[in-house]
C-alpha cells in the first residue's frame, strides 16, 4: 500500500460571499467537447461558446467575475499538440490579469491536455481547472452543470494551484489523470496518487 500524504480537502459552495469586494477574477477558455455540443444533422457537434455555457449555470456569477474566450471548438479527438500550445499561450498572455482559469474541454483527450499543460505552464501558482462532461449541457440528465460549478468553486477556493481536472466531484492532479470509463459520469481516475479535493 502506498503511503501518500493526505491531500484531500473539502470545499463548500457556501464559503463564497457574492457581495465580497475580494471576489476572484476568473478567465474561462473554451475548446469545444461534448459539454459544448448540440445535436446537428451531423450528430453532436461542439457549437456553444463559453458565454453560452455559463447561461446554463447562472449561480457561477455569484462566485466570481468571469471573462470568456473561445480558443477553438473541437471534438477533443481532434486536439493536437498545436492546440495545447495555443491554450498554454492564452494562459501566459492572461496570467497576470486573472486569479484563476477554467478550461472547458472534451473528455477523450482531456487527460492528455492536462498533462501537456502541466509541463507547458510549469510552476503555476494559480488554479488552472479543466472540466467537461459526458453529456451536453442542454440535456436534462447532464453532468455539465455540476462539473462547471465545481471547477469554478475550485478556481476560487484559494486552496489549489496548477493544472487539475475537476470532474464528477473529484479534483485530480493534471499529470495523474486518466479516462477510465466512457459511460459513467465518474469518467476519470487518479493513477497512483490521491485526489486533491472532493
Regions flagged by a language model, labelled:
Residues 6-22:
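Short, Lys/Arg-enriched N-terminal segments with co-localized hydrophobic residues
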Residues 23-198:
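Active-site histidine-anchored catalytic micro-motif
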Amino acid at each position: 500500500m502506498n503511503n501518500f500524504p493526505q491531500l484531500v480537502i473539502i470545499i463548500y459552495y457556501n464559503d463564497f460571499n457574492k457581495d465580497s469586494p475580494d471576489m476572484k477574477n476568473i478567465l474561462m477558455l473554451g475548446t469545444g467537447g461534448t459539454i459544448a455540443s448540440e445535436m446537428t444533422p451531423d450528430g453532436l457537434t461542439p457549437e456553444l461558446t463559453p458565454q453560452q455555457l455559463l447561461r446554463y449555470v447562472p449561480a457561477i456569477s455569484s462566485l466570481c467575475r468571469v471573462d470568456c474566450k473561445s480558443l477553438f471548438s473541437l471534438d477533443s479527438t481532434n486536439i493536437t499538440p498545436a492546440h495545447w500550445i495555443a491554450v498554454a499561450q492564452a494562459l501566459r498572455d492572461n496570467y497576470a490579469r486573472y486569479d484563476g482559469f477554467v478550461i472547458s474541454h472534451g473528455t477523450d483527450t482531456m487527460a492528455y491536455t492536462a498533462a501537456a499543460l502541466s509541463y507547458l505552464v510549469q510552476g503555476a501558482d494559480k488554479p488552472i481547472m479543466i472540466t467537461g462532461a459526458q453529456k451536453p449541457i442542454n440535456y436534462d440528465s447532464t453532468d455539465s452543470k455540476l462539473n462547471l460549478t465545481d471547477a469554478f468553486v475550485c478556481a476560487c477556493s484559494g486552496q489549489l494551484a496548477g493544472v487539475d481536472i475537476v470532474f464528477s466531484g473529484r479534483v485530480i492532479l493534471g499529470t495523474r489523470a486518466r479516462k477510465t470509463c466512457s459511460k459513467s459520469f465518474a469518467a476519470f481516475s487518479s493513477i497512483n496518487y490521491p485526489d486533491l479535493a472532493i
